[in-house]
């Protein structure tokens, strides 16, 4: 190869034809000022349109370009690697598949002196660039031969058509570049490069050609650590994005659906990669995503509850509002941005459900007051299913995915604590209310009693709240409250009995005493209704408590009715004493006094509740007729003629009609009493024995408690002394009495003749013949004709004699 020497030229800047421009100095590291300007000014384009940089020089043709040792096989010197000119060091060093993973160690020095240091001087940069340009070969100084071939002024030939270059392979990113993508929230792209890096690290172990041995710290172990660190950084950004998208206003909320979509794409990519990794090496990023959602939900709920006023009830209301707010964000903005296969809405719903279950479980383990337990149970059983889960997509609730917030054992424990506290609190409160009300019973002032209202309010507070939680809890609470009510009513009965037995109370004015008694009676109906309602709601074993409550109230009502009736009839007794006398046949004064007194007391009795009032009026109606008939059957008046019997019967009918009008005005329901006096009047007036027998049969049928002694006394009053007729009439009563011996006796409120005692029945003697010498006037006297029936011999007398 000929060696071209530099021929001396007068002007070094003007090259001659056929000569190569050479430098005055052969030192390749010598800095030459203006070298870059000369290159820019001298390099042009060929007439055919191609760049003059492509011209062939002798050094390039002969392979004499400096630093040839740095060229990689298969690549032209100075050819760009990725569209950019390679530096001198780039041509010297053999490029690897990816930049060394040691670059990741520079992360700790990114914020060092270089990051914040002064910029280097322009001269140093120029010298470094001049040094790097040495590997590019000699610089052309004049036009090439092709420039002289094309005459001036002629058009250059058309360049050949460009052949499309094959697609260039994307160069893998370095660890620092992947980290930069993560920090810029380009999560899907960063995950793709991490997967590539992981695949490169796993390639030798999957049957690839074994590479050269690598030094410790620079081989596969370092790349594996890089992958692990990149995954940690990626997950930090992913879970931070989950928190920020739920946090409302902030950087995460402004990220939009794009960032959430990238998160979902990462999950899909990693799930596909887990299928390739196998079960042992799977990263399970989808499960960790669900855990991150649960952590974010827990943070959201814990931040909402503490600042809410109103105790536990206020905190639960704040939780409800936060749940509705966050689930609306998930349903409207976050869930649509995720891929459909991830089931994002269900994941978020389960995350919030689990976080809420933890919060409620921690609250249930604390010692809560009764009101907070009620609030917790009601929120768990009613508010959450109806107002939270009822407003979300029911597809997430299929097959019981969510499960209960609290375990059945925890719920049962809370209910047991509620029942125990209610039992203790209500019994103490009921006794306190009874003691306070009893203090006013003996006072002379007429104060309205609020005992029944206070008792109902104390118990209904619990019996109304418990069924709204659950039916079973309502039954248990009703049984508990009914037991407490039964104990209270037994104490109430005992104190009412002591009140009426107190001699000082009997010294009160009748009107005051009646008013106090009416107040006690009025406690019965609301308490009775409460007991019946609790028994209907409660379990079957509540029946004994209901019966005990009803028995105590019945006893109190009967006692108070008897007291009121006794007070009234003490005032009426003088008028009843005037009945069935000679003056009674001609003057209605006695009955007018009875009717007037009862009518005057009706205003006071109207203050009584309807149920006890009806029972009291019926009792007054019965007792009034008993007191009216009593003097008649005691023989106070005797009829010696048909005219007298007719007058007595007429008077009886008039009085019966007047009493019937009185008690109708008092709204008495004891209509069965209206016929007793008219029946007696018929027996008094009828003359023939069969008619009397029929009337006696009707009387015995309607009033089963009538006995032969009552019929015999009635026959004595009307003056029936015929023995045969008496026996025929009494036989009717005896037959009906014997036929009904096995039947049950009428109830106490239907008894009439049982309360009317009569003298011992009399019988007629058949006088012997020696009495025939007595005057007929003596034999006609009733005292001789009818004598008292001898007492039957006692069965105990023979034993006494022995």
Curated annotation (Swiss-Prot):
Is Coiled coil set as a keyword in this record? yes
Q: Which residues form a coiled coil?
A: 647-673
| Record region (Disordered) | 1-50, 142-168, 200-221
A GO BP entry is: exocytosis
UniProt keyword annotation of Zinc-finger present: no
One GO cellular-component annotation of the UniProt record comes to: exocyst
Q: Which UniProt keywords apply?
A: Coiled coil
As annotated, the protein's associated disorder is: Brain malformation renal syndrome: An autosomal recessive syndrome characterized by brain abnormalities, Dandy-Walker malformation, and renal dysplasia. Dandy-Walker malformation features agenesis/hypoplasia of the cerebellar vermis, cystic dilatation of the fourth ventricle and enlargement of posterior fossa.
Q: Which family does it belong to?
A: Belongs to the SEC6 family.
Tell me the protein's name: Exocyst complex component 3-like protein 2
Supply the gene name.
EXOC3L2
